[in-house]
Amino acid sequence: MKGDKREEQGPGPETVAPQQPTEDEEALIEFHRSYRELFQFFCNNTTIHGAIRLVCSKHNRMKTAFWAVLWLCTFGMMYWQFGLLFGEYFSYPVNLNINLNSDKLVFPAVTVCTLNPYRYPEITEQLKELDSITQQTLLDLFKYNASTLEAQPRHRRDVHPPLPHPLQRLRVPPPRLEARRARSSASSVRDNSPEVGRKDWMIGFQLCNQNRSDCFYQRYSSGVDAVREWYRFHYINILSRLSDTSLSREQLGNFIFTCRFNQAFCGDGNYSHFHHPMYGNCYTFNDKNNSSLWMSSMPGINNGLSLTLRTEQNDFIPLLSTVTGARVMVHGQDEPAFMDDGGFNLRPGVETSISMRKESLDRLGGDYGDCTQNGSDVPVKNLYRSKYTQQVCIHSCFQENMVKECGCAYIFYPLPEGVEYCDYRKHNSWGYCYYKLQDAFSSDRLGCFTKCRKPCSVTNYELSAGYSRWPSVTSQDWVFQMLSLQNNYTVSNKRNGVAKLNIYFKELNYKANSESPSVTMVTLLSNLGSQWSLWFGSSVLSVVEMAELLFDLSVITFLMLLRRFRSRYWSPGRGAGGAREVASSPVSALPSRFCPHPTSPSVPQPGPTLPPSLTAPPPAYATLGPCLSQSGSACAPGEP
């Protein structure tokens, strides 16, 4: 019956099992099943030279080993070169580019000082007292009797009270006692009074701290240096009591006889004035306060600044200034004039012609150099209120430490807000503090030279000077006569009373130096590509292939670790067989290939494999296992 029924149905459509998805439909991303398969595929298809030899020579193990070693050595050499290239790039080298430009140039600022510290009427009596005590000291120490002494020396000492820190003769200790003398430097200087004729003594003065618990001697081997420094120390104390309102222009005297720029007269509106404690009255021509900056369109001595200066010192301070003439400095319009650091002296009776050449330098900051653009990132406050320069920062740093350590400001540098200049009437130990601080500053223990970085943009002027006698012997009479009539001033000592100064551009060509990165990112990539092509003869796509290989290796390693983890922790009750089953299931689930590649025709291709959930046997729980009856036969389910 059933057979007839089947015959009636005839050859109908056969029952077909659900078709398994093909390999191309299984997943969007597929990976190789082993390291060997991945490496073989890479060597067969990569564009890197030499990799195919690792597969083609697999039947000759010697060749395989040779090419493997050669490939690894080449790979190592290439990455060694890569390390050198990256090391050079991250050392941030720079190239110095030199350009020669020619154009109209802005004439720099020129500062000229009298070299004659001024005697202000407000402190005349105090300066006379200092001069008198100094003359008495010279008589006591060097038997020098100056003609300015109007009375006997002993009476002079009785009239004027002694100044603090008197100048003394100091005995030079033997070398073996120098360390002991340094430890006991607070001993009285009255014991150090050897005869003048002996050579084992020096000149100096004693300086102590506030409570006189520590003292030292400021000593000099030259008597001239000792007298000048001692006089200078007391002079700036007196000068600190002078108010700024006393520095009026009406008291400056006649210093500049004539002034011309580009053959045109320059007047009061072309210069500004300031006072220097040591160099006297100073005039700055063509500074930032000038109405319009001077321009030089032609080189030569007739197209620059020409000054005729008075160098007589009728009311000079001989114990403070031992030279005569004038001091000049060339600098930028927005830079202060540091006469001690960059100036030089002019001789009386001489025409000094100074030719200039401009030179600029632009440094690279950041990783390429330790420079600052405007000083805003420097931990030192600019006291000069001008453009940042390294000298501005260094002097501001010293003044900052002076105020912090000594409680007062040094008169040579700008006065900070809320601080007064040092005066031993108010700060009796400031000299001790200053000389200690000066020693620490010179040895960079204050850190000023480290804090103050170089500016990224600098403009310098290269100077060269020429000298000639002026005026000549045949022309000096009428020249001095004209100067006397024109300026209503009589030149008493003709040749030592005047000096002439010419400052001009030697040529309008100026050198512009600039730094540029020696190795840029483009250069680095080019060098890396050159090395890659040299050792492997490949391109950027080959680098992508290497990255893909590393990615596949990491994924396969992750899958292997995942299988091991699942076999150990996810199937605890299935025994060794279950562990082997679970461990082998991901392999069967993986695709057989990553992309088509030739295989042997004799090897049968594996068919679609059912997932482990369909082929695995049911779990063997202990309660469902076979039980034996007393007769030894198996019992049916539910049977006791």
From Swiss-Prot:
Q: What compartments host this protein?
A: Apical cell membrane; Cell projection, Cilium; Cytoplasmic granule; Cytoplasm
Cytoplasmic-side positions = 1-65, 561-640
Kindly list the cysteine pairs connected by disulfide bridges.
C113-C282, C208-C215, C259-C266, C371-C456, C393-C433, C393-C452, C397-C448, C406-C433, C406-C456, C408-C422
Keywords, comma-separated and alphabetical: Cell membrane, Cell projection, Cilium, Cytoplasm, Cytoplasmic vesicle, Disulfide bond, Flagellum, Glycoprotein, Ion channel, Ion transport, Membrane, Sodium, Sodium channel, Sodium transport, Transmembrane, Transmembrane helix, Transport, Ubl conjugation
**Description of activity control:** Originally identified and characterized by its inhibition by the diuretic drug amiloride.
Q: Where is this region: Disordered?
A: 1-23, 595-617
Membrane topology qualifier: Multi-pass membrane protein
Extract the InterPro entries matched here.
Answer: ENaC, ENaC_chordates, ENaC_CS
Q: Which domain of life is it from?
A: Eukaryota
Which GO BP terms sit in this record? multicellular organismal-level water homeostasis; sodium ion homeostasis; sodium ion transmembrane transport
Regions that span the bilayer: 66-86, 540-560
| Topology Extracellular: residue spans | 87-539
Q: Give the reactions, separated by semicolons, that this protein catalyses.
A: Na(+)(in) = Na(+)(out)
Q: Does the keyword Magnesium apply?
A: no
Q: Which terms in the Gene Ontology molecular function aspect does this entry carry?
A: ligand-gated sodium channel activity
What is the recorded post-translational modification? Ubiquitinated. Can be ubiquitinated at multiple sites and undergo monoubiquitination and polyubiquitination. Ubiquitination by NEDD4 or NEDD4L inhibits the ENaC channel through endocytosis, intracellular retention and degradation of its individual subunits.
Q: Where is this region: Gating release of inhibition by proteolysis (GRIP)?
A: 154-222
Q: Does the keyword Transmembrane apply?
A: yes
Gene3D superfamilies referenced in this protein's UniProt entry, alphabetically: Acid-sensing ion channels like domains (2.60.470.10), YojJ-like (1.10.287.770)
| Pro residues bias locations | 598-617
Record-linked PANTHER family: AMILORIDE-SENSITIVE SODIUM CHANNEL SUBUNIT ALPHA (PTHR11690:SF124), AMILORIDE-SENSITIVE SODIUM CHANNEL-RELATED (PTHR11690)
Known partners and oligomeric status: Heterotrimer; containing an alpha/SCNN1A, a beta/SCNN1B and a gamma/SCNN1G subunit. Interacts with WWP1 (via WW domains). Interacts with WWP2 (via WW domains); inhibits the channel. Interacts with BPIFA1; the interaction is indirect via SCNN1B and inhibits the proteolytic processing of SCNN1A and SCNN1G and the activation of ENaC. Interacts with the full-length immature form of PCSK9 (pro-PCSK9).
The family note in this entry says: Belongs to the amiloride-sensitive sodium channel (TC 1.A.6) family. SCNN1A subfamily.
Q: What is this protein called?
A: Epithelial sodium channel subunit alpha
Record the organism. Answer: Oryctolagus cuniculus
Q: Which gene encodes it?
A: SCNN1A
